[in-house]
Amino acid sequence: MRLILLGAPGAGKGTQAQFICEKFAIPQISTGDMLRAAVKARTELGVAAKKIMDAGGLVSDDIIIGLVKDRLTQPDCSKGYLFDGFPRTIPQAQVMKDAGVPIDYVLEIDVPFDAIIDRMGGRRVHLASGRTYHIKFNPPKVEGKDDITGDPLIQRDDDKEETVRKRLQVYDDQTRPLVEYYSSWAAQANPADKVKAPTYRKVSGTSSVEDITASIFAALK
């Protein structure tokens, strides 16, 4: 099972990625983790990436794909792998395709933006303990107070509506077009392609965690 997981920030990808990886006994591939490991191990690609990052630049797609190809040779990828957060853009998807990285499924968890803003904007946190509440779905016993200590709860900057809207706009501009990219590739599959076009599946991410998981497993049969 080799798949790419798509979905806007706050769509619940992280939760579902864990369930998918457990069911199919595959690793979750994170480009951030790969970069940190390569830099720490001082591999050729890691050294090249560190130079760029130290200069404040963005690591090129070619370096990322090099890291991906190295990662996929590891034994834990023998049954497949899950990409979450990569590719983010059509150029990255094209580089993956050109490099011959095989993908069986592209799975999108679809949640309307208004629901995501509601979901993320309602989060409140007790910083000292990490306890998390939601003003609508999991409210504290006393409004604005931690249940255990009575300390005030805060809203993280990342959860403020303005920040959430900006992140969703970036997703809409850069990543959502991947849905069309993969759908078109499947529809116009070319025998000359290095790798077979993946199957695109979309599931709704607005029901319970258990129902979403069941929908995902049904879609990946």
Curated annotation (Swiss-Prot):
Q: What class of enzyme is it?
A: transferase
> Known EC number(s)?
2.7.4.3
GO process annotations (BP) = AMP salvage
Q: Where does ATP bind?
A: 10-15, 123, 132-133, 207
One Pfam family name is ADK
Annotated region LID: the residues are 122-159
Main localization is cytoplasm
Q: Which UniProt keywords apply?
A: ATP-binding, Cytoplasm, Kinase, Nucleotide biosynthesis, Nucleotide-binding, Transferase
Entry's InterPro entries?
Answer: Adenyl_kin_sub, Adenylat/UMP-CMP_kin, Adenylat_kinase_CS, Adenylate_kinase_lid-dom, P-loop_NTPase
- Superkingdom to which the source organism belongs: Bacteria
GO molecular function (one): ATP binding
Q: Where is this region: NMP?
A: 30-59
What SUPFAM superfamilies does this protein's entry cite? P-loop containing nucleoside triphosphate hydrolases
| Catalytic reaction(s) noted | AMP + ATP = 2 ADP
Q: Is Acetylation there in the keyword field?
A: no
Q: In which pathway does it act?
A: Purine metabolism; AMP biosynthesis via salvage pathway; AMP from ADP: step 1/1
Q: Which HAMAP family match?
A: Adenylate_kinase_Adk
Family classification? Belongs to the adenylate kinase family.
Q: What is known of its domains?
A: Consists of three domains, a large central CORE domain and two small peripheral domains, NMPbind and LID, which undergo movements during catalysis. The LID domain closes over the site of phosphoryl transfer upon ATP binding. Assembling and dissambling the active center during each catalytic cycle provides an effective means to prevent ATP hydrolysis.
What does this protein do, in the record's words? Catalyzes the reversible transfer of the terminal phosphate group between ATP and AMP. Plays an important role in cellular energy homeostasis and in adenine nucleotide metabolism.
- UniProt-listed NCBIfam families: adk (TIGR01351), PRK00279.1-1 (NF001379), PRK00279.1-2 (NF001380), PRK00279.1-3 (NF001381)
* Name of the protein in question: Adenylate kinase
Q: What is the lineage of its organism?
A: Bacteria, Pseudomonadati, Pseudomonadota, Betaproteobacteria, Burkholderiales
